[in-house]
Amino acid sequence: MRTRLVDFDAVGWLKRAAKAAGAFAVVSVCLVTFAQAETRTLKLYNTHTKERVSITFKKNGRYLPDGLREANRFLRDWRRNEMTKIDPELLDLVWEVYQKVGASQPIHVVSSYRSPATNNMLRKRSSGVAKNSQHTLGKAMDFFIPGVKLATLRATGLRKEVGGVGYYPRSGSPFVHMDTGSVRHWPRMSRSELARVFPDGKTLHFPSDGKPMSGYKVALAESKSGRSRSSKPTI
């Protein structure tokens, strides 16, 4: 019995593979170049001081010192008029969420930086204020955007998997919390609710039953390799 060998053009296959890889590389470079060429501007409104501002904090992949200083000023602890250095990645996170939801109205800031004194004062009033809040580190913002459902903001923030996402639909002024700390969310969503946000189960977020979603290991591997977050730009 003779076995028929299938002809295999190794050279041709390598050429096609190289061509495909080259095309992929070109697309990747184009995407990176496009991202670096962006001008990132945040339109903000402080719900307490009534201040309005438009801050351009990044251009051509680089953070702008003047824009960062203006963000530090605007997102200050308004109660004590104290400032800190706001995490530039927080600005990126909020900007990317804003773009993703297709918003057009200014972002209404409820809270951002909190001095330790202000945080301690608020902790005495509410058990929902963390002792080591990301707000005290300049890494958090509580906000809402007129015309955008709060649930949509939460889902978009969850998908970014950059840090924490809090959901406060019953607050006097309903808002979401986003920070650049560890990946987590509250209140914990049920498994079915989280599955609607992540149909493939690929997420670092844990549902209320405390068990990881089906794609957790893949999400964790991507997170460790840096694929889930963009590389840090230059300041």
Features from the language model and the residues they span:
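Active-site acidic/histidine clusters and adjacent loop/turn architecture
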Residues: 59-108
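Loop/turn elements at helix/coil->beta-strand transitions in domains of secreted/extracellular proteins
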Residues: 51, 103-107, 161-165
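Acidic helix-start/capping segments at beta-turn-to-alpha-helix junctions
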Residues: 106-121
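Sec/Tat signal peptide C-region and signal peptidase I cleavage site
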Residues: 32-37
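Bacterial N-terminal signal peptides that target proteins for export
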Residues: 3-22
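Charged, often glycine-rich, active-site loop that binds/positions anionic groups
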Residues: 117-133
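Catalytic cores and adjacent binding grooves of peptidoglycan-active enzymes
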Residues: 40-45, 129-140, 145-235
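Bacterial N-terminal signal peptides
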Residues: 21-30
